[in-house]
């Protein structure tokens, strides 16, 4: 297991200085950092495959919390999009005991991402008096789970009634799946409404847009990470959007990982970046609806890439946009932007924002 320990030791060093996404300027150091992070993730995935088997690699992402323990033999996976929690183990001895511990800890974990290393098997999950999943999961009696006694009883129920096993030809995988409550997304969103309202007032950005960005980026997962090392609820990258915001606020350097994993700081930084896109980078677009479409797309792929859809000259691009209807701007960005991800992103955020405006 030495190579896995080595991976865990170097992970914080590589992750802390890697970046991509949400910006148009990348210097050579950032490219090297991104390549280093890609290498790390590739090695991490390869190691998981060696332990779990082919097609069994599951790694944390923007909308997926994945934590390995027990020398990588047990994992907890929360899919925030699907609303499912899957606890699995390949432990050869007492698999039920491994599952039971993981179930209890997952149900009772707090909401401090900076205290948990998702790229190692260190059991650093602490039981919280205010569990992150409280209200998003109910036990077999229909009650929310706050205390260890109720979590333990629910774990015993699950192991007795919902334990499954399967073979991948290499290992026997034991698992338990828990469905979250139907409105789990709203439950998570509600946790951050106060922070969203504060950032909205501070920067003059519509609450519905902030919430739509959060839903699209992370599904309100405070543990959100990505292969491009975007962090937290609004998936802010330290060296691009984070650095731009710090510079605009008269701060030197870049926001730390712990800063961006703090929900209030992440929402503040992400909203500040939206304001910069709206007021500075894309401020030459007159129609507020057209500008909103451009801002949304730029949050994903950068302001420069948005303007280049219309012209390589930024001023001319804004002038062209100003001759178009908002509907034509939307149609152009969702069909002609070079990034398929950015094209879909505008559709997703715009759709989500409509739902928040109706509330």
Curated annotation (Swiss-Prot):
GO terms for molecular function: hydrolase activity, acting on glycosyl bonds; peptidoglycan lytic transglycosylase activity. Keywords: Cell outer membrane, Cell wall biogenesis/degradation, Lipoprotein, Lyase, Membrane, Palmitate, Signal. A lipid is attached at residue 17 (N-palmitoyl cysteine). Residues 1-16 form the signal peptide. A lipid is attached at residue 17 (S-diacylglycerol cysteine). The keyword Lipoprotein applies. Pfam families: Mltc_N (PF11873), SLT (PF01464). It is found in: Cell outer membrane. It catalyses: Exolytic cleavage of the (1->4)-beta-glycosidic linkage between N-acetylmuramic acid (MurNAc) and N-acetylglucosamine (GlcNAc) residues in peptidoglycan, from either the reducing or the non-reducing ends of the peptidoglycan chains, with concomitant formation of a 1,6-anhydrobond in the MurNAc residue. GO terms for cellular component: cell outer membrane. It comes from the Bacteria. It is an enzyme of class 4 (lyase). It is a lipid-anchor. Its main location: membrane. GO terms for biological process: cell wall macromolecule catabolic process; cell wall organization; peptidoglycan metabolic process. Its EC number is 4.2.2.n1. Transmembrane segments: none annotated. HAMAP family: MltC (MF_01616). Belongs to the transglycosylase Slt family. Murein-degrading enzyme. May play a role in recycling of muropeptides during cell elongation and/or cell division. This is Membrane-bound lytic murein transglycosylase C. The gene is mltC.
